[in-house]
Amino acid sequence: MASALGIFIDRNIIKYAKLNGTKGKLKVESYGMKYGENHKELLKQIIEETNSSKNSVVINASEIHYEETSIFSMLKKKDYDKAVEVAYEEIVDKQKLRPELLEYGYILSKNPADSEKLHVLLGIQEKGAMETRANLFGQNVMLYSQMPIGISISNLYGSPLPALIVNIEEDTYITEIYDSEPIKVTRIATGTRNIINTINNEENSISKSYEVLRNMVLPTDDMDQISFEGNEYAPIIVSEIMKIVSEIKAVINKRPGIYKKIYITGTGATISNVETFIEKLIDDVECDILRPAGIEVQKKVAIKEYVDVNSAISLACEALRI
């Protein structure tokens, strides 16, 4: 049975999930997280502890640059690659980038604004950043790919309906899903980073700071007069969530009437009531926690634990859902 290990690398935390099975039926074999900034040592521990030296490993890419363009839908499929390449070269030339230093991938989907064209979402990476990240692993590790997390997170969405996936990690990634495919990714420098830093100033422990965050409860009764009584970290949490809400509204307003559903995932999704809190601040949308679609979960494991490592689960799917 095929197995793959997904690893999501952030500044102060590394999340991992090992999956096995086939495209139609995947199961989480093991999962967890490591804390700290010595990524090379932490990754070595993860590979050893999950016995994954002979399995495909998928990690999140660093320094991703997203662009959107389009190609004509009447083209034959065999001509898609060339058409996208031409569009990519135009973008590179316009922005005066150096193509020899870059690599790119793309996803095609229906164009919500023009039925005669296909929407193209480009993910552009610097080769140097890819090499630096690959060097965190030993030569014996089977590094399958480096995937943009804003794209791979869509692996866990099982509906054809348009939606936003808001992945709240140290930064936040807002992925727009249309016709089952990601069409745009917005990365914002607001997420759990400031919250963790604030808590860590008191707790002096990154791992403990994350546990404090996961045990937080957001108030939802009176949104006009939010009470911080008895919760010293609530102000910073509410402040960061409000910034994220503002960004979500901006995304929704750019495509009016399209998005009626928001899914929250990542570390931020483990804050109790976060989905209700966000839903009450945005008109005419439903907000829920993103449960990993198509993944067999163990009944004895709380869904909150899987949601916390959704970023890693979605990466592992890249090697198994082919």
Q: Which residues are covered by each model-predicted region?
A:
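Gly/Thr-rich phosphate-binding beta-strand-loop-beta motif of the actin/hexokinase/Hsp70
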Residues: 1-34, 53-61, 157-202, 207
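Active-site neighborhood for divalent-cation/phosphate handling
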Residues: 62-159, 294
